[in-house]
Amino acid sequence: MRGLRVVRGLRVLMAGCLLALVPGCASDAPDPLVVLGPWTGKEGEAFEAALQRLDDGTGRTYTYEGTRSLRETLVSQLEADTPPDVAVLNSIGELTEYARRGKLRPLAEPTRERAFSPWAPELLVDGSQRTYWVPLKVDLKSLVWSKKGTPSDRPTWCVGLASQATSGWPGTDWIEDILLHQAGPGPYEKWATSRLSWRDPDVVRAWTTWAQLLAGRTDESVEQSLTTSYEGTTGPAGPRGLLNSPGFDCTHEHQSAFIRYVYAGDDIRVEPSARFLRGRAENRDAFEVAGDMAAVFSDDPDAQELVERLSSPAGRKRWRAEADPAVRPLFPAVTGLPPTEPANAVEQEIDGLLNSTARTLCFDASDVMPPELRDAFHRAVLEFFRDPAKKHLASLLEQLETIRVQVDEDADDARSFRPPEDICAGPGG
């Protein structure tokens, strides 16, 4: 948060003082360029190691600030008028809001060429189409995890909905995935971009299908899922994963590709979620995806070069080389990326689904929605999980529809600004 900026400022000040003592050294050396991002632990270490190598020959120093409270940190820095040069966010809704408020700088070439749907759709601003962010890494959703040898004809679902301030998002992933496979990319895209009512039959059906798939839970089981992290319980070596967590009598887990890090070395199986969701056959090759996108918040022209280097084939190669296999990043396109050492079976399966099997990729719907609506969606999922009665669902969807309409009215400046609508696309954009 602001403390991070203070510490960085002190480091820069001390470095400047030392330089001033050396004859011939300039006392006005440029500040480091700061990247604010969501990765901590081993992910953060790998990204920071790659970043430190990418500034070679630039005359600038790149530094990384990683936090799990990314939104709160960025909001605090913007309020203090001390934004990072570059921030990496996973929410198109938040990025869209920052662009609307004039906080982002349009991307320069050649970075703009690496930004394509569904990860980085263009925005209409002041009558011009502009690109404000580029995907650095992506995650494939629409996946189901289980132990090898476990029958899949009658799965018992592991559910952990807790995630600190964003609790509920694992449930929104379920509903989004079900709607995508039942209704198809068209209705999904309209719903994600606030052009479809929350009372629409396709939306209602997705919620009720989720309740049916998870039916038969005891009050104790419901409370356990509401209070347990999506990473599962914690052991001496860290999160165990829901499939390995004591007290969870379950066989299958619906979760994004990133969860592979908690199952590293386990006898694990991953497969597409389509056949579990009571969807249509024609939608089986549609997949939900997420991403971490870089945007420029600074007028410093070197910040544009920083993002260009991060999103380049060389930047990807360096990042991938620094990462442990369990947290090795996935990229939105492999063109220009030199081959690396063979991946394990799970990575090979995920890579094949993302780059070969998938015909349509749709960005995570809640991450496209405006933050107010997304947060309300999270809360509604938690309430519905506790009480899935039809009458309760109708009340929750009415509340979400009211928020959708209100947010649209509050941001009714379509003549000068239009949020993205193309959040489903083929693998190549």
Identify the role of each PLM range:
Residues 21-24:
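C-terminal motif of bacterial Sec signal peptides marking the signal peptidase cleavage site
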Residues 26-28:
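Bacterial signal peptide processing site
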Residues 31-96, 100, 110-113, 117, ...:
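Early extracytoplasmic/lumenal segment of secretory-pathway proteins
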Residues 92-142:
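Hinge/lid segment of periplasmic solute-binding proteins
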Residues 134-135, 152-202:
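Extracytoplasmic/periplasmic solute-binding protein
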Residues 192-234:
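Glycine-centered hinge/linker elements that transmit conformational signals in sensory
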Residues 264-330:
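Extracytoplasmic/periplasmic substrate-recognition and gating elements
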Residues 353-429:
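Conserved C-terminal helix/tail region of periplasmic/extracytoplasmic solute-binding proteins
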